[in-house]
């Protein structure tokens, strides 16, 4: 049975994913912030989009291609950025990027992804977009953008609406150590979720057993997750202004 036959709708994948992933990981993937009102409004807005059919036009071959920023893609959507996708499944950045390149749609790599631009850029086959959380240090910002461009990313996605750490209440309820210096601290509850989801746990161990923010490691004195987390907290604190945007354009 093909994946399309098994999961004909996106909603059909929700429950299998919930069974396969530890609860704190699934909450990170599937839930929004706070009580989830913004996420619910977004889903309602997408559900309110209607396709208007046109009849009596003879034989027509549907064409979903579209042009964005001077480049043509096979469909009017792409893969949005998710930080630390490798937490959800080891190697997820590579898996999704290859799938997007094969489908001819954009793949957007997050600043705080588990893989770096140098790894993902060549896989994207010219379809790579890079999402930037603007660092306070302009030198780091310029170097990140230079690395992304050198790696083959063609489009910049600048995130402006995250002024600070979000309230991930579903993750807190699922047992994730929210507020800890090391967000991957192994609490008894997290440990139990890991051993009761062996497929995910073995995949993580086979991938080295570590979660990393590889794009940002060159700018921190140590690569340990807790130090990178401290660095992210000090550098990515929502201080974006129009002057900063002008600096990016230069």
Each predicted region: which residue ranges?
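An N-cap/entry alpha-helix motif that binds or orients negatively charged groups
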Residues: 1-70, 179-182, 186-240
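A structural motif shared across PLP-dependent enzymes of the aminotransferase-like
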Residues: 34-37, 87-93
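Active-site microenvironments in enzyme catalytic cores
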Residues: 65-66, 76, 80-81, 113
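A short, Lys/Arg-enriched amphipathic alpha-helix followed by its capping loop at the start of a domain
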Residues: 75-77, 96-105
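Hydrophobic faces of well-ordered beta-strands that scaffold small-molecule active sites
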Residues: 77-80, 107-109, 128-132, 156
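Short glycine-enriched loops at secondary-structure junctions
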Residues: 83-85, 110-116
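Alpha/beta enzyme core
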Residues: 84, 97-98, 102, 119-123, ...
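A structural-propensity feature for long, helix-poor, extended segments
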Residues: 117, 124-133
